[in-house]
Design a protein with these regions (language model features):
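Glycine-rich, aromatic-flanked loop segments that form ligand/cofactor-binding clefts
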Residues: 2-19
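Alpha/beta enzyme core
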Residues: 14, 19-68, 76-92, 102-213, ...
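Short beta-strand elements of ligand-binding domains
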Residues: 96-99, 216-218
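A charged, well-structured terminal subsegment
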Residues: 248-250
């Protein structure tokens, strides 16, 4: 998916669908699950109609495990939600799933159940901090499970600098993480820096050393900055912008269309 887009010089724009808290989590209230289904379908259609390439369905439970495993009910409910999205969009619309904070193997299981296209991995390589504890990558476990359930076709984005993977910006550290991600077979690397100049420097450094590695921007773009920030990147995950600045609310189809107009002019 991501490598094909890079080879074809396409920009994949993927909207974030932020769900309500899942059953079995501390902040779940009765009705949240049903609201999540309706919201996911609505947001996916808004993205599709606005011209985005796909979506990333993401749990928003407020409190998360720091390890890779999670409660069965989160996996089951996420599978149903993603399945409902799959039923309501065209076959070319890309669907990604991410059970936060770093539940990679459960996310792969969901992707398997709905013929999903990709997942996003907070810590596929390296070590990072989070509000919920230290995250230690375990790529051997991930790739053994991926092979076991035959999800090699599910692309995996490795976060190496951004919202969830905290590494700052040191070029040697950054490129070391790209090297690790490339070595184990990540489909793309994700970066994000709020300072656009630094963000573009990071893109340039990766592109110079790893010209074939797809780069995903993990945030920080809006309609005004999409063209300049995406010039050297291959894809973007877009959340708050498509929600008109109201994080976690519904996606505005018109905003998606305006963003895509800028991207298509690159």
């Amino acid at each position: 998916m991501f490598r094909e887009a890079r080879e074809q010089n396409k920009k994949l724009i993927l909207g974030l669908i932020h769900l309500r808290p899942m059953p079995g989590t501390p902040y779940y209230i009765d009705g949240d699950y049903e609201k999540s289904i309706k919201k996911a379908v609505f947001d996916a259609k808004a993205l599709e109609n606005g011209g985005a390439a796909g979506c990333l369905i993401q749990t928003v439970d407020k409190v998360y495990p720091s390890g890779d495993d999670t409660d069965y009910v989160r996996v089951a409910c996420m599978s149903i939600i993603a399945s409902e999205v799959r039923k309501n969009v065209g076959q070319d619309f890309k669907i990604g799933v991410q059970i936060m904070w770093n539940c990679i193997t459960p996310s792969l299981a969901v992707a398997k159940s709905v013929n999903g296209d990709f997942t996003r991995c907070t810590a596929l390589v390296g070590t990072t901090t989070s509000p919920f504890g230290t995250l230690e990558a375990d790529p051997l476990k991930v790739f053994e499970y991926r092979k076991k359930i035959e999800t090699e076709s599910v692309d995996m984005i490795a976060e190496i600098a951004g919202y969830h993977f905290k590494s700052g910006y040191d070029e040697d550290t950054l490129l070391g993480l790209v090297q690790s991600a490339n070595m184990i077979g990540a489909s793309a690397v994700e970066i994000m820096h709020r300072d656009e100049e630094i963000n573009n420097q990071m893109e340039a450094a990766i592109r110079a050393s790893f010209p074939h590695m797809p780069i995903v921007l993990g945030g920080g773009t809006d309609v005004a900055s999409a063209k300049s920030r995406l010039r050297n990147a291959d894809a973007a995950l877009v959340g708050r912008c498509f929600e008109d600045g109201n994080w976690g609310s519904g996606i505005n189809e018109k905003t998606v269309a305006a963003y895509m107009k800028e991207v298509n002019s690159i």
